[in-house]
């Protein structure tokens, strides 16, 4: 009996130790909070339909990602959502059907698919009795267009082989987040997935979750939030990397586009930024391979602790005679079939920043 008692006691102690270790290494995330949701509602623009529902989705996203529900974070979310969709979960896009048809034809031409093949595919009858071409004429939202193309690709003959990359909708939801980003960051998604992550992006809850992840789910050293807004549009750390490109240009004497892209992705050939850094390799005491490998880390926070990053600024600051900025607004022209005006990342960031400061209480500004 003593043997079994000692065995039970040891098992109990072991179980308690495991539980305590679990608590120590995995602190509980805060649950959604009515108080936080009340604050979100107060900071949202007046006239938002179902403000309580929006607040609940925002609160859940913040809690699930361990992002503090500060006034600044909430106002950043509000500002981006207001800019991107006006707090409409399924915003209508004027002229979307024509835009989509032009984009489909452009992609077909790029793949050397004859126009008659596209026309024949669009003439195929879809499950609702209409042809895909007829349905395309009626689309009003990106969600409708994305669903149409997913159906189209799966149903028409050779659809996956010919048209697998033809879905023109690569962003969606009320924060217009990249679907590729969402698919790469779905590990802790707190909701049951309705079919696919693409579908979830077009839901209010999913669009807000992934949009908030893209906006606030990474550390930065920025002293002004406008750079985070620019990154939301141009990609994580684009503002930091654009500033580095400016420093590289000063140090090397080679003019560079300040677009935040440090390497030429999808190519073995070095881009302009990498060539400029290579011209400094003796001063940096680095090989071309070391330079390339380091620049490839440019989408990480740790990149700014690299010897390359520090040495470039040492050189550039000395030449400039003053510390150069560590963040600048990227000079990127916005490219999208939906955009009909000459807009830039800087324009986007400034517009969102204006909305942000209107949201922030007067004492905070």
Predicted stretch roles:
Residues 1-9, 15-365:
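Cell-wall glycan-active module
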């Amino acid at each position: 009996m003593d043997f079994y008692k000692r065995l039970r006691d040891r098992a109990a102690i072991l179980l308690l130790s495991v539980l305590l270790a679990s608590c120590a290494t995995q602190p509980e995330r805060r649950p959604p909070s009515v108080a936080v949701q009340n604050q979100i509602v107060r900071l949202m623009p007046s006239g938002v339909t179902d403000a309580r529902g929006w607040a609940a989705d925002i609160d859940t996203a913040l809690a699930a990602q361990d992002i503090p529900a500060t006034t600044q974070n909430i106002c950043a979310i509000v500002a981006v959502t207001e800019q991107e969709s006006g707090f409409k979960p399924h915003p209508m896009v004027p002229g979307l059907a024509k835009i989509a048809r032009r984009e489909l034809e452009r992609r077909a031409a790029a793949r050397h698919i004859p126009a008659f093949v596209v026309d024949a595919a669009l003439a195929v009858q879809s499950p609702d009795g209409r042809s895909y071409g007829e349905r395309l004429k009626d689309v009003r939202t990106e969600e409708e267009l994305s669903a149409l193309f997913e159906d189209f690709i799966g149903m028409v003959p050779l659809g996956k082989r010919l048209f697998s990359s033809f879905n023109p909708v690569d962003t969606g939801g009320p924060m217009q987040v990249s679907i590729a980003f969402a698919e790469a960051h779905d590990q802790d998604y707190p909701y049951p997935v309705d079919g696919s992550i693409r579908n979830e992006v077009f839901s209010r809850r999913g669009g807000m979750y992934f949009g908030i992840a893209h906006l606030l789910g990474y550390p930065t050293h920025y002293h002004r939030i406008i750079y985070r807004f620019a990154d939301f549009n141009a990609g994580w750390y684009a503002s930091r990397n654009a500033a580095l490109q400016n420093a590289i240009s000063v140090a090397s004497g080679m003019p560079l586009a300040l677009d935040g892209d440090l390497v030429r992705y999808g190519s073995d050939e070095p881009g302009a930024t990498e060539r400029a850094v290579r011209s400094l390799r003796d001063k940096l005491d680095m090989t071309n391979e070391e330079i390339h490998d380091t620049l490839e880390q440019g989408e990480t926070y740790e990149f700014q602790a690299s010897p390359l990053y520090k040495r470039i600024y040492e050189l550039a600051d000395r030449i400039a005679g003053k510390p150069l900025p560590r963040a600048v607004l990227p000079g990127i022209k916005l490219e999208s079939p939906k955009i009909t005006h000459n807009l830039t990342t800087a324009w986007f960031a400034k517009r969102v920043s204006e909305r942000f400061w209107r949201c922030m209480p007067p004492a905070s500004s």
